[in-house]
C-alpha cells in the first residue's frame, strides 16, 4: 500500500466497502457492540473478505484520534479519484455540474459540501489550494462516505481555472446575496460551475469578476444568509430539478 488513510465511522467505511473493498487493509471494530447496525456491518465486511480486528474503545480512540468513531475505524489505501481537472472533464458524459468553493476552510463545512455534491450528482468539488482545507479525518467523517466518491480538486489559481472552464464551454455561475437575478430564473441545464463563497465573506473580488453571471437565493425569513453547505444544496438541486424536467410535447 503506497499511501494510506484512516476511515472513521460507519458511513465512511461502508462507502469504501461498496466502492472498493480491496483497497481496505484492515478494519478495527468495537468488540463489545452487539447491536443490529454493527452486526450488519460485520457481515458485509466479512463477505468482502476484509481483515477484521476486534478492539476496545480505548484502542479505537487512539487509532482514530477522536471519541467520535462509532466503533468502526479502517486503514485503507488513499484513492485518487481524478488526476486533474482536464482528465475529469474529458471523462464526463453529458453537461458537467461542478461545485466551486472559494474560501471554505472549515472541515465540517467541506465535509457537508462533499455530501451534498454526492447527493446531487455533481462531478467534482474544486477549491483553491491557499484558501481551502484538505480531506482530513473530520472532513471524511462529516462527508459520510462522499469523500470516497466525489473528486476534490485543488488548484493554484482559481480565477485562471474558472477562465479555463469557460474556454471549455462551462458557464460559471457565482452566488451573491445582492445579485439581482433569482436562482430560480437562472438556466442550469447546460455545463455549469457553481461558485460558492465563504459564509459571511462571499467570493473574493477576482473570483466574482470572473463569473459569467451572479444569482441570489430568495430569502423569505429574517436570516440574511445560509450555511455554505445548505446554500450549495439549494443551488445544486435546482440544477438537478431543471435537468430532470421533461419538456412538454
Swiss-Prot record:
Keywords: Cytoplasm, Methyltransferase, rRNA processing, S-adenosyl-L-methionine, Transferase. InterPro entries: 23S_rRNA_MeTrfase_RlmB, Alpha/beta_knot_MTases, Ribosomal_eL30-like_sf, rRNA_MeTrfase_TrmH, SpoU_MeTrfase, SpoU_subst-bd, tRNA_m1G_MTases_N. The keyword Cytoplasm applies. It catalyses: guanosine(2251) in 23S rRNA + S-adenosyl-L-methionine = 2'-O-methylguanosine(2251) in 23S rRNA + S-adenosyl-L-homocysteine + H(+). GO terms for molecular function: RNA binding; rRNA (guanosine-2'-O-)-methyltransferase activity. S-adenosyl-L-methionine binds at residues 197, 217, 226. GO terms for cellular component: cytosol. Gene3D superfamilies: 3.30.1330.30, 3.40.1280.10. It is an enzyme of class 2 (transferase). Pfam families: SpoU_methylase, SpoU_sub_bind. It is found in: Cytoplasm. The keyword ATP-binding does not apply. Its EC number is 2.1.1.185. Belongs to the class IV-like SAM-binding methyltransferase superfamily. RNA methyltransferase TrmH family. RlmB subfamily. Specifically methylates the ribose of guanosine 2251 in 23S rRNA. NCBIfam families: rRNA_methyl_3. This is 23S rRNA (guanosine-2'-O-)-methyltransferase RlmB.
Amino acid at each position: 500500500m503506497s499511501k494510506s488513510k484512516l476511515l472513521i465511522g460507519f458511513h465512511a467505511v461502508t462507502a469504501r466497502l461498496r466502492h472498493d473493498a480491496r483497497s481496505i487493509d484492515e478494519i478495527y471494530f468495537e468488540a463489545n457492540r452487539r447491536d443490529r447496525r454493527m452486526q450488519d456491518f460485520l457481515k458485509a465486511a466479512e463477505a468482502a473478505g476484509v481483515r477484521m480486528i476486534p478492539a476496545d474503545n480505548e484502542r479505537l480512540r487512539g487509532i482514530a484520534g477522536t471519541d467520535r468513531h462509532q466503533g468502526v475505524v479502517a486503514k485503507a489505501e488513499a484513492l485518487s479519484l481524478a488526476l486533474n481537472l482536464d482528465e475529469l472533464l474529458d471523462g464526463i458524459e453529458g453537461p458537467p455540474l461542478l461545485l466551486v468553493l472559494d474560501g471554505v476552510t472549515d472541515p465540517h463545512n467541506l465535509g457537508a459540501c462533499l455530501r451534498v455534491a454526492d447527493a446531487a450528482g455533481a462531478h467534482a468539488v474544486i477549491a483553491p489550494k491557499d484558501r481551502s482545507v484538505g480531506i482530513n479525518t473530520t472532513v471524511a467523517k462529516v462527508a459520510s462516505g462522499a469523500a470516497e466518491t466525489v473528486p476534490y480538486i485543488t488548484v493554484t489559481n482559481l480565477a485562471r481555472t474558472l477562465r479555463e472552464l469557460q474556454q471549455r464551454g462551462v458557464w460559471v455561475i457565482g452566488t451573491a446575496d445582492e445579485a439581482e437575478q433569482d436562482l430560480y430564473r437562472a438556466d442550469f441545464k447546460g455545463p455549469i460551475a457553481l461558485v460558492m463563497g465563504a459564509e459571511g465573506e462571499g467570493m473574493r473580488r477576482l473570483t466574482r469578476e470572473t463569473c459569467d453571471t451572479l444569482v441570489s437565493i430568495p430569502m423569505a425569513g429574517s436570516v440574511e444568509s445560509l450555511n455554505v453547505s445548505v446554500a450549495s444544496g439549494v443551488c445544486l438541486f435546482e440544477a438537478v430539478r431543471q435537468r430532470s424536467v421533461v419538456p412538454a410535447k
